[in-house]
Amino acid sequence: MKFKSTVIAASVLAGIMSLSAGAYAMGGASGAHVNYPTTGKIGAVMMNPYGIAPLTAVIRNGGYSLSDISVRIVPKDGGQEITYTVSDAKARTHGGIPIFGLYAGYRNTVEVSYTKTTEGKSERVEKEVYRIYAGPANIATAGYAGVTSVFPVAEVKKVDPAFSDRLYLINNMIAATPNTTRAVWNNPMGGALEWNRYPQNAIYDTKGEIRWYMEPSKIYDPNNIYMAGIMMGFRQNNDGAFTWGYGQRYVKYDLMGREIFNRQLPDGYADFSHAMDPMQNGNYLVRVASADHARPDGKHVRTVRDVIIEVDQNGTVVDEWALWDILDPYRNNVLKALDQGAVCLNIDATKAGQTITAEQLAELDKTDNFGDIVGAGAGRNWAHVNSVDYDPTDDSIIISSRHQSALIKIGRDKQVKWIMGSPEGWGPKFADKVLKPVDKDGKPIKCEGSKCEGDFDWTWTQHTGWRVDSKSDKDVFYLSVFDNGDARGMEQPALPEMKYSRAVVYKIDQKKMTVEQIWEYGKERGHAWYSPVTSLTEYYQDKNSVDRKSVV
C-alpha cells in the first residue's frame, strides 16, 4: 500500500509541475511535438495496431520517410529466429515498421535497421534495439471439462534442419458453445447456417511457440448470423495477405491484421465453407450455396455446399457453377456407404458405423427435411464440395466432392472434362469422363468396380484436390489430395480400426485420359493416422516437399 501511495503522489506532482510550466493540460493539444514515449530514433510503438493480431506492432515512423528496412525478432534461448525485410510501400501503408512474430507473454527483443529521411537529409540506423512486451495469448475459451489451455499446445516430435525456418498457420476452432449453432435459415429453409464455431487461429514456429494469433472479436460475433460461421479456407496470396471465409462472409486481411476487404456474400448466395481460392487473374473462386433454389418439385430451398462463384476484386460475381445442373445430384453410390457418425464437422458418435440405404434416401427426398444432412438432390448435402482450384491453361476449375468421392474438372462452359474417382454410378453421360488408372509405364491397371490391382487406389471422402502448379502444364496435370478414406471401396469395413488415410499425388495425362498414382503416404500408418474429417495435402516447390495436416 505504501508503494502505491508513492506512485500516486508522484503522478499528481508531475501533473502540477506540467501545468505550472505553462504546458497544455492533459487532454489538450500537444503543440508542435508528439508526446508519446519513444525508445529509439523514430516514433512510438503501437501494439496490435488493427485490433485482431495481438502479437504484432508498428514502430511508428516518427515523421520520417523510412526505407531499406530489415527486422529481426531475437529468439528465446534455443528458439526460432524470425527475420524479414520491409518494402517502402509497406512502411508507408502501416505508418512505420511493421513487427510480426513476437512471443506471447514475453519481453521481446527486436532489432531494426532502416534509413530515415526528412527535408532531404538521411541517416542510416543499424540494429536499433526495441524491448517490446506482448501479453499472453488469450481469446475466448469453452467451458468444457477437457479444455486445459487457450490454444492447442504443440508437441514438436522432430524438425529437419532444412525446415527449421518454417512457420505454420493452424486454422482451428473450439467446440460448439451455447451461444453458437442456435439459428437456422427460413424463407426458404435448408442450408448450413448452424455451422458456427468460435475461431482459434494461430501461427506456430518449429519450436512449438505461438508467434501470431487472431483475436477475432472485432470481426466475429456468434450472435449475429452475418458475422458468424466457421473460419475456413485460409490461403496466402501472392501479395502476402490472407483470404478466407466464414458463414456469410469472405475476407482479406494482411498479416498485421489490416483489413483489405471484409464482404458479405452476394445476396443470392449463402453459407461459405472450406474454400476460397485466389485465381491467377486476380479473382477468387468461393465455395458457397444457393440462397433460394427452385427444385423440379416446386419446393424452394437453400442448397448445401454445391455452388462455386467467381468474384472479382470489386465483389462482382462474374460466373457461377451450380453443380446440380452440371453433375448428377442423385448419384447415391457414395452416400449409401458414408459413415453417418462423421460427416465432415458434423460429428455424432451415436451413429458411428451406420449407413443409409437407397430406399431411405428416396423416402427422404419426398419430405420437407432439408439442410445440412446427407441426402440426394439439391437442398441436402449430396456434393459437399470442400476445395476448388483453377487451371489457367484451359480456364477450368477442379473441385473436390467429398460425398461423390471424386475430383472433377469442369470447364468455363460448365462441361465436365474429367472425373478422378471410382467409376460406379456415373451413368452414360459421364462414363467416358472417368480417368483410367495406369502404372508408371503407362500400362492399364485392372480394376473391378472400385477396387484396383497393385497399390493404386481412388480417393474416398477426400479433401483439398489441388493442382500442383509448378509441375503441371496444359497436357499433364499433377494433383495433390488428402484421401480421408471413409467409405473406401464403397463400403464400411468390418472393423473401424481397418480405416486409414493417405496423402496422395496423382499424375493425370489429360489427352490420354489416364491417371497414375506417383506418391502416397499414410497407408502404412494404419488407423493411427486415420482422419475421418477435414485435413489437407499440399506440395511446396521451395523445398520439394509435401505438407500434410490432418485431424486424428
Where are these regions (language model features)?
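Short beta-strand segments within Ig-like beta-sandwich modules, predominantly Fibronectin type-III
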Residues: V86-R92
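Histidine-/acidic-rich catalytic cores in large beta-rich domains
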Residues: M26-K76, R92-G96, F100-V552
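Gram-negative bacterial Sec-dependent N-terminal signal peptides
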Residues: M1-Y24
